[in-house]
């Protein structure tokens, strides 16, 4: 008999489903924002301001929690602002049904500026590439 000390795949799935229950939103932020692992909740501090952007960001659509092997991961559609005229450095994904609980911080690597359409393109829908995953 062998033991493999681990968080079970089912526990990962249930935890991620709990985070994804309700409404998930993506808010965009300027380079002046201070977001990271210690971020607790959504804040308007240093949130993007500009044409086509509304405080609080956009609702994530087609949210699905999946598993592959021992990884649970979250998939959702690309997030689009159209029209758009603003600059963003990163984003916060948060859950409005859990007191605006911060779920994930995304760093775009540099300022991204648009005067037409702004799209946050999600990676492949796989356990190895998803933006939010419990491995």
Regions found by a protein language model. Name each.
Residues 1-89, 96-135:
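Small cysteine-rich, disulfide-bonded extracellular modules of the LU/uPAR three-finger superfamily
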């Amino acid at each position: 008999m062998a033991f493999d000390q681990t968080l079970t795949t089912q526990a990962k799935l249930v935890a991620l489903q709990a985070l994804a229950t309700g409404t998930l939103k993506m808010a965009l932020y300027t380079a002046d924002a201070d977001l990271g692992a210690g971020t607790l909740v959504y804040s308007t501090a240093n949130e993007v301001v500009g044409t086509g952007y509304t405080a609080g960001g956009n609702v994530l659509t087609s949210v699905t929690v999946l598993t592959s092997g021992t990884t649970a991961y979250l998939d959702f559609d690309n997030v689009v602002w159209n029209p758009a005229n603003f600059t963003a450095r990163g984003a916060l994904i948060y859950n409005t049904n859990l007191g605006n609980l911060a779920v994930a911080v995304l760093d775009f690597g540099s300022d991204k500026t648009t005067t037409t359409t702004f799209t946050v393109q999600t990676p492949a829908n796989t356990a190895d590439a998803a933006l939010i995953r419990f491995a």
